[in-house]
Design a protein with these regions (language model features):
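Basic, polyanion-binding surface patches
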Residues: 1-214
Length: 214
């Protein structure tokens, strides 16, 4: 519903922190990429990112936008991707909400979130970084392209586009080539500290240009 009164906000006046709050509170719901990587020294890393989406099916690609830390430095996920050119986007099922959230803490460099939160690294099919064994779906990716957004200060990000080279899926979560949402139980990110669940689903027929509008 609308009050009829519209406010115009200038990003320059709102500022970086204010715009971040508007983005996470207005772009809803956001799917969560539970990204696993590995450093050149062999240390695994696991972190959730909600600036994430599908890009293309030919070639099959996903995108994850990785913001800088508050001091402007790069996160371990980005450092690992730049070093190895590989990563895995694991699904974010509701039953892993607590562990997923725990992985968002800023652990010291060289510490594996797999070990800290008690998740199981499983061997991937075509990339070196492990997938999360507890997740029913994983997209194994090789780096396709990175795009720097901003000047590298707080709020800047690197848009990472990954080409999917393999998909790992629990057989209970797929039927006739279609993924089953009730088996995936996807978690989504909302504004502030809030998360969401996909509980109510409805279908609409795909319209044609000749079908009457209602």
């Amino acid at each position: 519903m609308s009050s009829g009164k519209i406010l115009t906000l200038d990003p320059n006046e709102v500022g970086q922190v204010g715009m971040y709050k508007l983005l996470i509170g207005g772009v809803l719901p956001r799917p969560i990429a539970f990204v696993s990587t590995i450093s050149s020294e062999g240390v695994t890393n696991l972190a959730p990112f909600s600036f994430f989406n599908a890009v293309s099916s030919n070639p099959p690609c996903l995108s994850v936008s990785i913001t800088r830390k508050n001091d402007g430095s790069k996160k371990d996920t980005l450092r690992n991707i730049e070093a190895t050119h590989q990563f895995v986007v694991n699904s974010s099922p509701a039953w892993l909400a607590e562990k997923l959230n725990a992985c968002s803490a800023e652990f010291p460099h060289g510490v594996s979130e797999f070990e800290k939160v008690g998740l199981t690294p499983a061997e991937s099919a075509r990339v070196r970084p492990p997938r999360v064994a507890e997740c029913p779906l994983a997209f194994e990716c090789e780096l396709y392209e990175t795009v720097e957004i901003g000047d590298g200060s707080q709020g800047s990000s690197t848009l990472v586009i990954g080409k999917i080279v393999a998909v790992q899926v629990d057989e209970s979560a797929i039927r006739d080539g279609k993924l089953l949402i009730d088996q995936l139980e996807p978690l989504s990110r909302l504004g502030g500290l809030s998360y969401g669940l996909t509980r109510e689903i409805f279908d609409l027929p795909r319209p044609s240009a000749n079908s009457p509008s209602r």
